[in-house]
C-alpha cells in the first residue's frame, strides 16, 4: 500500500477512510485547493482509487464533497504548472496543487488505471481531451504509459473488469452471473458474439452496463438480440456504443420492437462515428417504414468498410423506401464488392416502380444470397436484372410468392430463360407460391437443362397451384423436361394439384438420374382409391429401382391413410432411401405396425418423420420394439401431435415407448467429432484464471515486504529476499505454464500448422493403402470362389464358351471397394478418435504438471511471505516510529465501496478476503470448485420463494386421531343399520365425493326433536333453528381448547383402539392434495363434545387424565362404536378483555392448519339480534315443554338429570348424568353414556368443578342450525374435518349418529397451569351455577363474561400453550 503523504495528517486520513470505506485501497492522496466562485479557494483532499476519484473536505471529521468515475472525464486541461482542470459530465473542477509533479502523478495514475482496466485503448481516447502546456509534459506522460508492462487481459479481453468499472460509473449493481457466463461459457465457446438472449432473464436495466462495456471492449465484434423487446434505455446505450466503438462489426436487432425514431437515431450514431467498423446490420421484424430506412440509407452510402450483410425483411417498406435504399447502396463504391447478403422479404413491393432496385441488381456485384420472397415483385424483371449483374456469385435466390406477369399468347421474355441457363453459381431456387403458367415453367426447366455449369441445384416449385400453375399443361411440361435435367438434385412439387397426371409424371421422374430429394406431398387429396393404387405402385417401382439415385422422399400431408402402407411395405428391402417423410397421412396403428416391420429389416434409413398419423400408445410400443432391432436409424423426431393425444389417453405406455425409442436412437447415433480445444479453453478459463488470481494476490503481499525490507541489513534477511525474488519470477512465468505445456511438441505429432501430415496421419495413410490392397485381394479370391461354386451347382450353363470370363469381368466393378473408403474410415473416424484421445491425455498431463508446479509455487510463496513477515515484525518492534507504515501494509482487505451499490463481491474480491496463510493448494482447489459453480441468478430471487410458500404445508405423516363428528343428512327412515363387527370391515369408497347441499328446509317436527332423539335417529332436528347461537356469536370469547390430543405419547387407549384401522387407510392417501387435506380428514376419538383442535408448535397440551375417565372410556370402547357428531364452528367476537387470548388461540389454529391463513368475523346488526333473540325465547319454551313430556315418558328405572356446562364462550354443552335417559342422545345402551360422560368431564376439568353437581339445570336451548340448512358459502379450509370428509364410523344397531350442540372453544393448558390443576379445583364453578347463569339473559351474560374475562388471568394461569410468545390477532371466518 502506498505510504501516506506527508502533507495529509494521519488523523485526517483516518477520517477519510471512515467516509469512503476502510477496505477501499487508496492509491494517491493529495492536498489541493479547489477554486470556487471568483478567486476564492477551499482546502480539499483528492483521493484516487482504482476507478474513481473522491474530493473530501480537509477538516476533521472529513466530509465527501464530490466523487466521479474516470469514465466521466470529458477532458483535462493543465495550462498552468500546478493547476489541473477536470471536466466531467456533471461539473468542471479547477484544482491547484503543491507542485507540477503532483499534477503529473495524478494524471499518470488515472491513465495507468484506465490502461489496466481497458487494455488496447489509449487513456487519451478514454479521457477524450487532454491538454497540457508545455506539450512535453503530455509526451512524457504518454511515454510513461507506453513503457508500463501490462498483464495479460482476462477472458474475452478483460470484459469482467470493464463491466465492473461501468457498473461503478453508471451506478448499477454488479451481477456475478454475468461475469461467470462471460468468463466461462463465452471463453469456452471462443465466440465473439455478445447475445442479449443469454441475459434476457435479467431486468432491462441490468442490460445497460453489459452493453455499455462494449464501447471499450476489443474482444466482442457482434451484438445480437432476437425476439427480445428492448426498452428505450437499452436502445440508447446501443446507439452510444455504435457511435463510439470502432470494434463493433455486426449489429443484429431482430424483432426488437424498434420504430422509426430508432432508425433515425441509428443514422445519427453512424454519422457521429466516421471510423465505424460496422458491416452487418439486421433490423428485420421492426417497423422502420420508409422514413427510417431512408435516414439509414444515407449513412449506408458513407460506411467506410461498406456493407456485407443487410437484412431489412418485414420492416414495412414500400417501393419508395426500397428505391431510396438501393440508390444509396449504388452510391457507395464499396458495396458492389462487399455486399453478399441482401434480404428485403416480407415488404409489399408490388408494382413497376422499382427501377432503382433493378438498376442496383443489374450492376456487377457480389451478392450471394438474395431474398425477395413475399414481396410480390415482378419475377421476369428481377431475372432480367440478375442476368446483367448477378451471374457470377448468386447462389441462393428466393423469389417465393412473387408475380410473373405473363399473359397468354405472349412470349416469355428471353432474359428469363437466359438467366437460368447462364448462371454460374446457383444452388437453390425457391419459386414456391408463384403463379407459373406452362410457358415460364418450360423456360425455367429448359434453361436449367442447358446450363452445364450448375450442379446440385435445389428447385422448389411447391404450392404453385394458384390459377393455371401446374394443372395439366404444367404437368405435361414437367413430364417432357424433367427426365433430361441433370443438375437438379432436389425437387419439391408438393401441393400442386397433380392428382390426374401423377401416374405418368412419376414414370418420367424415375428416369431422372440426378434427383436425390423428391417431395410429392399434398398431391393425393382428391384421388379415388382405384386411381391412387397405380400411382403408388409406380412410386414403389421408382424407389425400388437398383439404379435409383433417390435418397429422400416426402409424402407429407397427403392424407393417404391406409394406402400409405404400400410405400411402407417397400421400405423394408429398400437400399436407396435414407430419409422418408410420411407425416400427415393418418395411417393409424396399423400403419405404425407396418412401419415397425419395415424398420426391423431396413439398414439404409437414417431419418424417419412420422407425425400427424393418429398413432396411439399401441403404435408407439410397436415402433419401440422394432427400434430395439434397428441399429442404423439415427434421427426420428418425436411425433409431437400424436404423442400429445396418446399421453391423454394412456400416459404410462406412451411415455415408456417414447423413452425406449429415444434410447435406441441414442444408441445408434455415435458422435465422433470432438472439439479438441474446447476442453483446453474451459480448463484455462476456470482453473488457470482462478489459480493466477491467488498467485497475484500473494505476490502483491510478498512484493510489499520486499520493498519494506530491501534496505535492511543482515545476511539472513538478504538471503530470504533473494529467494523471494526468484519465487516471484517463477510465479510470473507460471501464468504461461499450462499453454506452453499443452502446445509443446504439437507440431511433431499433429503436423506443423496443417502444412504437413503428422506421424499418426502418415501411419494411417500407409495403413489404409495396405488394407486396401489386402481387401482387393480378398475380394478377387471371393469372386473366383463364387464362380467356382456356380460351376459346381450349374455345370451345364457354365460350360458355355467365355461365360466364366464374362461373369468375372462384369462382376469386377461391382465387387470392388472405392480406394477412398478405407482411407476415410481410418483417417476421419479412427484417426479422429485417436487424435481426440491423444488431446485428452495431453490436456490431462499438462494440467497435472501445471497444477503440481503451481501448488509448489503457492507453498513456497506462502512460506517466503511468512519469513518476510517475521523479519518485518521484528524490525517493526525495533522501529516504533514506523507504526503508521505497518498499519498501511496490513490494511489490504477490500470491501464493498460506499459509492457502489454492489451487494455481492466478485470472485477476485472474495479471494482478497482470504488471509495469506490460507493461500495453500487446498484452498486453491476449493476456490476452483467454487469458481466452477455458476452463481444463482437474481432473477430467481425476485420470484416467489418456494420454500416459504410450502412452509405452511404440513409434512405428510400420519396424523393422530382428532375429536371428530359426522353429520347425518339423510332422514331416519332411509338409514339401514349394520352390525358393528360388519361395519368395521366395510370401507366407504365414495366418502371423498362432494355431497349435494339440501335445498328443502327441515320441518318443524324435526326441530322439536332436539331434546330427545329416538333410536332411529332424527339428526336433522338440530338444523331447524336459523337464529340459534346469535347471542353466543356476540358474547362468546375465542379461547384455547383443552382437548388437544394430537400427541401420540398422550393418546389414550380409546384413541388407538378404534382409529388403527382408519389410520392405515388414511396413510395410503398421498399426493400433494391429500397432503394438505390430511389434517382435516384425520380420525378423531369418539365424543359428544364438539371441539376443534388448535395445534401449537410446541406440542399438544391437555388436561390431566382422570382414572375413572379412562376406565369408562375403555369400557365404552370395548362395548361399541362411538357416536359421531358434526363439528360446527361458531364465530365469536373479540372484546377488550379476551382480545389477547383470542389472538393466541387463532394463532395456534393458524399454525396447525394446513393453510395457516387468517380468519375473520362476520358482524351482524343489533336489530337482527333482537328479532332472533325473541324467536329463540319462544322456541326455548316449546322445547322445555317437549323435554318435560319426553322425560316423563321414559323408563322410570333410568332416572336422568340433564345438565349443561357454560364456559367462557357463553356456549352450552350437554352434561350427561347417570339419570339421563339413554335415548336422550340417541343411545339405547348404558355403554354410550358411560363413554360420553367422562369425555365431557375430562375435557372441561380445568374450567369446571371436579365434583358432580347436585342441582338440576335449565333445559337446553335449540342448538345452532347445521351448515347444510344454510346457503353454501365458500370458506377457507380449516383444521377441523368437514362432514363430507369425515368417514362414517361403524356403529351397532342401537347407535345412530346424533348431531349435537355447536363446539366450544376452550383454553389449552400450559405446562405451568397443568401443574396447578389439582390446587385450582378447590374453588370450582358448579354445573348448577353454570345453568343458572344460562337463564339470565344476554345482558347479564355479557356483563358476567366481561367480569370473568378481566380477572381470568389470576384464575386460570397461562392463556396460551406457547407461553411467552406474543400472539398475533387473528379472526375466525365462517
UniProtKB/Swiss-Prot annotation:
<keyword id="KW-0206">Cytoskeleton</keyword>
<dbReference type="GO" id="GO:0030838">
    <property type="term" value="P:positive regulation of actin filament polymerization"/>
</dbReference>
<feature type="compositionally biased region" description="Basic and acidic residues">
    <location>
        <begin position="1108"/>
        <end position="1132"/>
    </location>
</feature>
<feature type="repeat" description="LRR 5">
    <location>
        <begin position="391"/>
        <end position="418"/>
    </location>
</feature>
<dbReference type="GO" id="GO:0016607">
    <property type="term" value="C:nuclear speck"/>
</dbReference>
<feature type="compositionally biased region" description="Basic and acidic residues">
    <location>
        <begin position="1141"/>
        <end position="1150"/>
    </location>
</feature>
<dbReference type="GO" id="GO:0044877">
    <property type="term" value="F:protein-containing complex binding"/>
</dbReference>
<feature type="repeat" description="LRR 1">
    <location>
        <begin position="245"/>
        <end position="269"/>
    </location>
</feature>
<dbReference type="GO" id="GO:1900026">
    <property type="term" value="P:positive regulation of substrate adhesion-dependent cell spreading"/>
</dbReference>
<dbReference type="InterPro" id="IPR001611">
    <property type="entry name" value="Leu-rich_rpt"/>
</dbReference>
<feature type="modified residue" description="Phosphothreonine">
    <location>
        <position position="1229"/>
    </location>
</feature>
<dbReference type="GO" id="GO:2000813">
    <property type="term" value="P:negative regulation of barbed-end actin filament capping"/>
</dbReference>
<feature type="modified residue" description="Phosphothreonine">
    <location>
        <position position="920"/>
    </location>
</feature>
<protein>
    <recommendedName>
        <fullName>F-actin-uncapping protein LRRC16A</fullName>
    </recommendedName>
</protein>
<feature type="coiled-coil region">
    <location>
        <begin position="714"/>
        <end position="738"/>
    </location>
</feature>
<feature type="repeat" description="LRR 9">
    <location>
        <begin position="574"/>
        <end position="597"/>
    </location>
</feature>
<feature type="modified residue" description="Phosphoserine">
    <location>
        <position position="1096"/>
    </location>
</feature>
<keyword id="KW-1003">Cell membrane</keyword>
<comment type="similarity">
    <text>Belongs to the CARMIL family.</text>
</comment>
<feature type="modified residue" description="Phosphoserine">
    <location>
        <position position="1289"/>
    </location>
</feature>
<feature type="modified residue" description="Phosphoserine">
    <location>
        <position position="122"/>
    </location>
</feature>
<dbReference type="GO" id="GO:0044354">
    <property type="term" value="C:macropinosome"/>
</dbReference>
<feature type="modified residue" description="Phosphoserine">
    <location>
        <position position="972"/>
    </location>
</feature>
<dbReference type="GO" id="GO:0045111">
    <property type="term" value="C:intermediate filament cytoskeleton"/>
</dbReference>
<dbReference type="GO" id="GO:0031941">
    <property type="term" value="C:filamentous actin"/>
</dbReference>
<dbReference type="GO" id="GO:0016477">
    <property type="term" value="P:cell migration"/>
</dbReference>
<dbReference type="GO" id="GO:0030335">
    <property type="term" value="P:positive regulation of cell migration"/>
</dbReference>
<feature type="modified residue" description="Phosphoserine">
    <location>
        <position position="1363"/>
    </location>
</feature>
<feature type="modified residue" description="N-acetylmethionine">
    <location>
        <position position="1"/>
    </location>
</feature>
<feature type="region of interest" description="Necessary for localization at the cell membrane">
    <location>
        <begin position="1058"/>
        <end position="1092"/>
    </location>
</feature>
<keyword id="KW-0677">Repeat</keyword>
<keyword id="KW-0175">Coiled coil</keyword>
<dbReference type="GO" id="GO:0044351">
    <property type="term" value="P:macropinocytosis"/>
</dbReference>
<keyword id="KW-0963">Cytoplasm</keyword>
<feature type="compositionally biased region" description="Basic and acidic residues">
    <location>
        <begin position="1232"/>
        <end position="1244"/>
    </location>
</feature>
<comment type="subunit">
    <text>Homodimer. Interacts (via C-terminus) with heterodimeric capping protein (CP); this interaction uncaps barbed ends capped by CP, enhances barbed-end actin polymerization and promotes lamellipodial formation and cell migration. Interacts with MYO1E. Interacts with TRIO.</text>
</comment>
<feature type="repeat" description="LRR 7">
    <location>
        <begin position="485"/>
        <end position="510"/>
    </location>
</feature>
<keyword id="KW-0007">Acetylation</keyword>
<dbReference type="GO" id="GO:0046415">
    <property type="term" value="P:urate metabolic process"/>
</dbReference>
<dbReference type="GO" id="GO:0007163">
    <property type="term" value="P:establishment or maintenance of cell polarity"/>
</dbReference>
<feature type="modified residue" description="Phosphoserine">
    <location>
        <position position="1291"/>
    </location>
</feature>
<feature type="repeat" description="LRR 3">
    <location>
        <begin position="304"/>
        <end position="327"/>
    </location>
</feature>
Amino acid at each position: 500500500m502506498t505510504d501516506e503523504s506527508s502533507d495529509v495528517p494521519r488523523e485526517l486520513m483516518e477520517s477519510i477512510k471512515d467516509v469512503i470505506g476502510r477496505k477501499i485501497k487508496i492509491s494517491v492522496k493529495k492536498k489541493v485547493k479547489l477554486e470556487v466562485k471568483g478567486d476564492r479557494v477551499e482546502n480539499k483532499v483528492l483521493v484516487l482509487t482504482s476507478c474513481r476519484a473522491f474530493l473530501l473536505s480537509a477538516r476533521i471529521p472529513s466530509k465527501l464533497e464530490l466523487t466521479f468515475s474516470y469514465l466521466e472525464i470529458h477532458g483535462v486541461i493543465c495550462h498552468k504548472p500546478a493547476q489541473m482542470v477536470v471536466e466531467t459530465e456533471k461539473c468542471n473542477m479547477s484544482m491547484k496543487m503543491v507542485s507540477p509533479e503532483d499534477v503529473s502523478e495524478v494524471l499518470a495514475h488515472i491513465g495507468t488505471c484506465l490502461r489496466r482496466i481497458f487494455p488496447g485503448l489509449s487513456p487519451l481516447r478514454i479521457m477524450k481531451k487532454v491538454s497540457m502546456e508545455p506539450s512535453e509534459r503530455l509526451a512524457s506522460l504518454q511515454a510513461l504509459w507506453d513503457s508500463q508492462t501490462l498483464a495479460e487481459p482476462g477472458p474475452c479481453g478483460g470484459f469482467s473488469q470493464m463491466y465492473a468499472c461501468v457498473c461503478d460509473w453508471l451506478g448499477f449493481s454488479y451481477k456475478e452471473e454475468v461475469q461467470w457466463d462471460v468468463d466461462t461459457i463465452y471463453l469456452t465457446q471462443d465466440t465473439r458474439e455478445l447475445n442479449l438472449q443469454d441475459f434476457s432473464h435479467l431486468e432491462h436495466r441490468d442490460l445497460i452496463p453489459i452493453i455499455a462495456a462494449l464501447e471499450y471492449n476489443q474482444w466482442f465484434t457482434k451484438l445480437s438480440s432476437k425476439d427480445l423487446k428492448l426498452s428505450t434505455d437499452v436502445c440508447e446505450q446501443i446507439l452510444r456504443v455504435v457511435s463510439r466503438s470502432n470494434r463493433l462489426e455486426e449489429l443484429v436487432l431482430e424483432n426488437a420492437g424498434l420504430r422509426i425514431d430508432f432508425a433515425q437515431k441509428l443514422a445519427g450514431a453512424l454519422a457521429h462515428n466516421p471510423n465505424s467498423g460496422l458491416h452487418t446490420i439486421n433490423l428485420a421484424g421492426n417497423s422502420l417504414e420508409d422514413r427510417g430506412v431512408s435516414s439509414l440509407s444515407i449513412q449506408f452510402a458513407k460506411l467506410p468498410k461498406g456493407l456485407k450483410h443487410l437484412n431489412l425483411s418485414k420492416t414495412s417498406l414500400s417501393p419508395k423506401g426500397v428505391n431510396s435504399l438501393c440508390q444509396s447502396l449504388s452510391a457507395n463504391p464499396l458495396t458492389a464488392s462487399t455486399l453478399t447478403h441482401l434480404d428485403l422479404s416480407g415488404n409489399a413491393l408490388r408494382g413497376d416502380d422499382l427501377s432503382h432496385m433493378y438498376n442496383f441488381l443489374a450492376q456487377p456485384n457480389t451478392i450471394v444470397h438474395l431474398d425477395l420472397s413475399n414481396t410480390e415483385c415482378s419475377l421476369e424483371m428481377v431475372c432480367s436484372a440478375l442476368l446483367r449483374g448477378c451471374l457470377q456469385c448468386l447462389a441462393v435466390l428466393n423469389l417465393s410468392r412473387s408475380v410473373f406477369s405473363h399473359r397468354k399468347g405472349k412470349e416469355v421474355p428471353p432474359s428469363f430463360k437466359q438467366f437460368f441457363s447462364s448462371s454460374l453459381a446457383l444452388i437453390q431456387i425457391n419459386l414456391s407460391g408463384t403463379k407459373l403458367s406452362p410457358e415460364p415453367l418450360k423456360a425455367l426447366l429448359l434453361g436449367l437443362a442447358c446450363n452445364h455449369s450448375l450442379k446440385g441445384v435445389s428447385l422448389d416449385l411447391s404450392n404453385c397451384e394458384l390459377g393455371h400453375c401446374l394443372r395439366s399443361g404444367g404437368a405435361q411440361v414437367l413430364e417432357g423436361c424433367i427426365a433430361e435435367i441433370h443438375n437438379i438434385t432436389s425437387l419439391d412439387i408438393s401441393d400442386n394439384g397433380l392428382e390426374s397426371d401423377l401416374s405418368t409424371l412419376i414414370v418420367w421422374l424415375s428416369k431422372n438420374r440426378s434427383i436425390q430429394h423428391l417431395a410429392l406431398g399434398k398431391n393425393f387429396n382428391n384421388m379415388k382409391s382405384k386411381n391412387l393404387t397405380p400411382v403408388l405402385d409406380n412410386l414403389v417401382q421408382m424407389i425400388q429401382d437398383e439404379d435409383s439415385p433417390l435418397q429422400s422422399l416426402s409424402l407429407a400431408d397427403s392424407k393417404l391413410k391406409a394406402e400409405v402402407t404400400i410405400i411402407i411395405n417397400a421400405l423394408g428391402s429398400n437400399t436407396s432411401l435414407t430419409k422418408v417423410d410420411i407425416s400427415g397421412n393418418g395411417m393409424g396403428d396399423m400403419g405404425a405396425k407396418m412401419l415397425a416391420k419395415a424398420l426391423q429389416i431396413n439398414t439404409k434409413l437414417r431419418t424417419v418423420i412420422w407425425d400427424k398419423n393418429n398413432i396411439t400408445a399401441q403404435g408407439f410400443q410397436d415402433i419401440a420394439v422394432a427400434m430395439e432391432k434397428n441399429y442404423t436409424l439415427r434421427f426420428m423426431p418425436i411425433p409431437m401431435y400424436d404423442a400429445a393425444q396418446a399421453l391423454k389417453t394412456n400416459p404410462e405406455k406412451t411415455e415408456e415407448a417414447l423413452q425406449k425409442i429415444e434410447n435406441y436412437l441414442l444408441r445408434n447415433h455415435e458422435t465422433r467429432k470432438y472439439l479438441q480445444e474446447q476442453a483446453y479453453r474451459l480448463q484455462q478459463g476456470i482453473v488457470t484464471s482462478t489459480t493466477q488470481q491467488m498467485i497475484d494476490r500473494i505476490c502483491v503481499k510478498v512484493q510489499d515486504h520486499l520493498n519494506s525490507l530491501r534496505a535492511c541489513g543482515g545476511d539472513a534477511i538478504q538471503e530470504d529476499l533473494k529467494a523471494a525474488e526468484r519465487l516471484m519470477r517463477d510465479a510470473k512465468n507460471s501464468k504461461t505454464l499450462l499453454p506452453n505445456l499443452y502446445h509443446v511438441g504439437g507440431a511433431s505429432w499433429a503436423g506443423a500448422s496443417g502444412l504437413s501430415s503428422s506421424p499418426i496421419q502418415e501411419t494411417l495413410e500407409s495403413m489404409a493403402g495396405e488394407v486396401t490392397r489386402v481387401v482387393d485381394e480378398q475380394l478377387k479370391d471371393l469372386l473366383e470362389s463364387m464362380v467356382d461354386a456356380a460351376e459346381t451347382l450349374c455345370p451345364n450353363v457354365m460350360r458355355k464358351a467365355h461365360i466364366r470370363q464374362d461373369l468375372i469381368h462384369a462382376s469386377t466393378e461391382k465387387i470392388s471397394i472405392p480406394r477412398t473408403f478405407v482411407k476415410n474410415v481410418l483417417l476421419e473416424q479412427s484417426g479422429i478418435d485417436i487424435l481426440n484421445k491423444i488431446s485428452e491425455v495431453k490436456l490431462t498431463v499438462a494440467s497435472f504438471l501445471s497444477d503440481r508446479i503451481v501448488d509448489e509455487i503457492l507453498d513456497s510463496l506462502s512460506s517466503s511471505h511468512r519469513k518476510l513477515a517475521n523479519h518485518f515484525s521484528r524490525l517493526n518492534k525495533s522501529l516504533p516510529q514506523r507504526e503508521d507504515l505497518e498499519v498501511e501494509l496490513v490494511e489490504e482487505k477490500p470491501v464493498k465501496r460506499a459509492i457502489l451499490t454492489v451487494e455481492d463481491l466478485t470472485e477476485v474480491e472474495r479471494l482478497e478476503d482470504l488471509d495469506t496463510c490460507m493461500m495453500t493448494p487446498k484452498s486453491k482447489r476449493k476456490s476452483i470448485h467454487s469458481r466452477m459453480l455458476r452463481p444463482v441468478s437474481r432473477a430467481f430471487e425476485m420470484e416467489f420463494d418456494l420454500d416459504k410458500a410450502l412452509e405452511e404445508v404440513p409434512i405428510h405423516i400420519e396424523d393422530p386421531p382428532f375429536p371428530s363428528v359426522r353429520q347425518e343428512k339423510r332422514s331416519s327412515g332411509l338409514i339401514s343399520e349394520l352390525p358393528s363387527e360388519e361395519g368395521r370391515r366395510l370401507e366407504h369408497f365414495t366418502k371423498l365425493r362432494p355431497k349435494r347441499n339440501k335445498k328443502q328446509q327441515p320441518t318443524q317436527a324435526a326441530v322439536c326433536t332436539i331434546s330427545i332423539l329416538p333410536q332411529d335417529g332424527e339428526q336433522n332436528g338440530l338444523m331447524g333453528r336459523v337464529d340459534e347461537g346469535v347471542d353466543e356469536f356476540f358474547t362468546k370469547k375465542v379461547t384455547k381448547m383443552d382437548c388437544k390430543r394430537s400427541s401420540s405419547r398422550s393418546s389414550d387407549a380409546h384413541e388407538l383402539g378404534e382409529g388403527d384401522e382408519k389410520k392405515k387407510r388414511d396413510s395410503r392417501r398421498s399426493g400433494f392434495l391429500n397432503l394438505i387435506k390430511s389434517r382435516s380428514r384425520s380420525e378423531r376419538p369418539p365424543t359428544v363434545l364438539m371441539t376443534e383442535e388448535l395445534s401449537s408448535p410446541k406440542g399438544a397440551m391437555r388436561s390431566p387424565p382422570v382414572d375413572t375417565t379412562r376406565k369408562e372410556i375403555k369400557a365404552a370402547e370395548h362395548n361399541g362404536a362411538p357416536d359421531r357428531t358434526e363439528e360446527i364452528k361458531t364465530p365469536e367476537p373479540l372484546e377488550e378483555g379476551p382480545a389477547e387470548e383470542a389472538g393466541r388461540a387463532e394463532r395456534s389454529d393458524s399454525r396447525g392448519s394446513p393453510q395457516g391463513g387468517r380468519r375473520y368475523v362476520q358482524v351482524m346488526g343489533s336489530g337482527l339480534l333482537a328479532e332472533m333473540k325473541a324467536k329463540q325465547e319462544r322456541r326455548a319454551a316449546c322445547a322445555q315443554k317437549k323435554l318435560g313430556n319426553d322425560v316423563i315418558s321414559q323408563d322410570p328405572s333410568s332416572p336422568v338429570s340433564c345438565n349443561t356446562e357454560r364456559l367462557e364462550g357463553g356456549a352450552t354443552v350437554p352434561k350427561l348424568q347417570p339419570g339421563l335417559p339413554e335415548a336422550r342422545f340417541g343411545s339405547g345402551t348404558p355403554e354410550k353414556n358411560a363413554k360420553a360422560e367422562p369425555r365431557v368431564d375430562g375435557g372441561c376439568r380445568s374450567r369446571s368443578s371436579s365434583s358432580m353437581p347436585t342441582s338440576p339445570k335449565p333445559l337446553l336451548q335449540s342448538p345452532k342450525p347445521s351448515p347444510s340448512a344454510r346457503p353454501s358459502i365458500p370458506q377457507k379450509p380449516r383444521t377441523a374435518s368437514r362432514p363430507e370428509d369425515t368417514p362414517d364410523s361403524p356403529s351397532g344397531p342401537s347407535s345412530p349418529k346424533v348431531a349435537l350442540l355447536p363446539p366450544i372453544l376452550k383454553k389449552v393448558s400450559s405446562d405451568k397451569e397443568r401443574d396447578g390443576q389439582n390446587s385450582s379445583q378447590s374453588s370450582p364453578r358448579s354445573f348448577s351455577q353454570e345453568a343458572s347463569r344460562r337463564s339470565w339473559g344476554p345482558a347479564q351474560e355479557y356483563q358476567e363474561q366481561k367480569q370473568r374475562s378481566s380477572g381470568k388471568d389470576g384464575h386460570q394461569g397461562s392463556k396460551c400453550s406457547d407461553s411467552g410468545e406474543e400472539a398475533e390477532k387473528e379472526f375466525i371466518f365462517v
